[in-house]
């Protein structure tokens, strides 16, 4: 199982996203991550293998601010539990951040096409 939460509004996104992840903990998971977009367009992106409290500790050491974000808890169906396989995933230019729940059936085709275009993958999922 996994949990996905997002926020867009006038308040700081991070506390809302973390609260949502804490509320989803009962579903079970092996890793967690968050991406928050700041007003200048920069993205704070943190992932960890482990609990939401570990993610919160990593975030406390960084300045991740913004009013738009997405967060995810993951239970591995493909790839081992690791920081690299935790969501949000990003493209190699750090311009697109993606979370998903489940299996992307055509992942091999998509991966092959993106590799041909020169993209670099950092995860097994």
Identify the meaning behind each predicted range:
Residues 1-125:
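Conserved short alpha-helical segments that host acidic/polar catalytic motifs at enzyme active sites
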